[in-house]
Design a protein with these regions (language model features):
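Metal-dependent phosphoester-hydrolase catalytic domains
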Residues: 2-13, 18-28, 32-33, 37, ...
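N-terminal, active-site-proximal structural segment of metallo-dependent hydrolase catalytic domains
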Residues: 2-45, 49-136, 149-155
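Structured beta-strand-rich core segments of catalytic domains in phosphoester-bond hydrolases
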Residues: 66-77, 119, 123-218
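Residues that flank catalytic or metal-binding motifs in active/ligand-binding sites
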Residues: 81, 154-156, 193-197, 217-222, ...
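Active-site beta-strand/loop signature of hydrolases that rely on acidic residues for catalysis
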Residues: 84-90, 108-133, 160, 199, ...
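Acidic/histidine-rich helix-loop elements
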Residues: 87-104, 177-190, 227
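Solvent-exposed loop/turn segments at secondary-structure junctions
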Residues: 90-93, 125-129, 148-151, 165-166, ...
Length: 347
């Protein structure tokens, strides 16, 4: 979902964001405090602590807290060391109460620490908010991203990862428009800038188990946030994402995370993303799964068997051992207006 879709105001897009700067980077792992050249602003840590104030309106909603164990705990033990993936629309940081970032941040911290995902595709995060999350996750996490209006401006499609398990090999950003490498571009009728970030990861743990270095386990993760209002823009965005995925090394599996702003199985965008046999919905393909809820709740009571607009898609060669929609809250306070979606995958 997008901010305007829930009746809230989104941060104003920065002016002059349509420059023609294009950024590509490859090679070595990135420094934790590296500042990406050009448009990118990535890996940063450190943030002020805040005091949580529980949201009375959320408590009144009567939404049940997630069961008293991490979602990944339900995944069966496997010898292949499954990768824990999460997609999470963070709800951009604001001071508006209830559900301000100051109220939500402590719950977000607890959720992420207990789940300990290896990689997280996030949506809507603002630069300072992402720095808060990086600090809360701890020094063994890093992240890649850039603001959709360029640099640190506006919302990010940032990708966090556990650097003890994963090492980035290369990454890039592109904008969902006819000019995908023009920063801040939007040409399909949408008023909000939309973009995608992808990263090629190496599984460090797997590589360490194969000391001959002849076998490396790598994969691509692409993270995005489609438009909340314009169906044409969503459909064109889906086609562009498929084109970009097809340009990547065909030998490596793909994982796609995002807020697609349409319900799974109910929209041509879903058909476009999963058609042709190149991507499958991890929720449908999972060996086991949690109860289903609408992944956007807007701080209202949860909807059992509701629409899934936040997805984790994978190459067919990837096995999803367990998929879950995480309803974790503390005293009625949710960390976001979306529920995180999680998958334990292996290949």
């Amino acid at each position: 979902m997008d901010d305007r879709a829930s009746g809230m105001t989104e941060p104003e897009d920065a002016a002059g964001a349509g420059g023609q700067l294009r950024e590509r980077a490859a090679g070595a792992a990135f420094s934790r405090r590296a500042v990406l050249r050009g448009a990118a602003a990535t890996a940063a840590v450190g943030a002020a602590s805040v005091t949580a104030v529980a949201s009375a309106s959320a408590r009144e909603a009567g939404s049940a807290a997630y069961e008293d164990r991490p979602a990944y705990a339900a995944a069966p033990h496997d010898e292949n060391r499954s990768l824990r993936v999460m997609t999470f629309n963070l709800r951009y940081a604001s001071d508006t109460r209830p559900n301000s970032w100051a109220e939500r941040r402590p719950v977000m911290r607890k959720l992420l620490r207990r789940e300990a995902p290896h990689v997280i595709g996030t949506q809507e995060g603002l630069y300072g908010q992402l720095r808060d999350i990086a600090a809360d996750l701890g020094p063994h996490y890093d992240w890649v991203g850039t603001g959709r209006a360029g640099g640190s401006k506006d919302e990010f499609a940032a990708v966090f990862y556990d650097a003890r398990r994963l090492a980035p090999v290369e990454y890039d950003h592109f904008w969902l428009s006819d000019t995908p490498y023009a920063i801040g571009s939007r040409t399909w009728g949408n008023t909000v800038i939309r973009m995608a970030t992808w990263v090629r990861f190496r599984d460090i743990e797997y590589s360490q188990d194969h000391q001959d270095h002849q076998t490396q386990r790598e994969f691509f993760l692409l993270n995005t946030h489609l438009d909340h209002a314009v169906q044409y823009a969503r459909e064109r965005s889906a086609e562009l994402i498929k084109e970009r995925l097809a340009e990547l090394d065909p030998a490596l599996p793909r994982v796609v995370t995002g807020d697609f702003n349409v319900a799974a199985h109910k929209n041509p965008v879903y058909d476009a993303m999963t058609g042709g046999g190149r991507l499958v919905d991890s929720w449908d393909a999972a060996d086991g799964r949690s109860a289903q809820y609408a992944t956007f709740h807007g701080y209202r009571p949860l909807v059992p068997d509701g629409d899934r607009i936040d997805w984790i898609l994978t190459s067919p060669s990837v096995r999803t051992r367990y998929a879950s929609i995480n309803t974790y809250s503390v005293d009625g306070q949710f960390p976001s207006d979306h529920l995180p979606v999680q998958a334990s995958i292996a290949w």
